[in-house]
Amino acid sequence: MESIKTSHKFESILPKQKKFQSILPKPKWLRVKLPTGQKYTELRGLVDKYKLNTICTSGSCPNMGECWGEGTATFMILGNVCTRSCGFCGVKTGRPESLDWSEPEKVARSIKIMNIKHAVITSVDRDDLKDMGSLMWVETIEAIRRMNPKTTLETLIPDFQGIERHIDRLVNAKPEVISHNIETVKRLTRE
């Protein structure tokens, strides 16, 4: 093994070579498995065919192979570019493209093909839209209901900037579960 060459001032902060050899291997439960299997391949094909977004791909989730291998995914609507820049999130930030109004049907069709009994839908924040994307949320829920009447729906929604009429619009669509992540406390959020 080649020695690490350092200047004198850095020697105290760099670990000695012998320490590298004494580091324990990662436990098996911490290792991410490579995505494989028929279900993974089928799901990858659907996502590519219908140009769908999932939080799995957009958020660079390390568990994607495991979830997709079991035939589960969290669909992400309203595009794959968020108008916010949360420090805890891996989704791209910027100026989103215009809405794809065929997205609700594509998501519903994929859920039908996958025979999903419980679908999870999330979205990017769309502060650039007058309705914050609430109409697209309703359109997606209704499309899923039409094509998959027995599928239960879990919605992981943005805050819609706290505008009640947008939140009410989604609540009135009656998904079985409405949830909202609060990822961190204010004192830990970058200003």
Task: Label the model's feature ranges.
Residues M1-R84:
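Flexible, acidic/Gly-rich N-terminal and inter-domain linker regions that tether
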Residues E70-L188:
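Conserved Radical SAM active-site core
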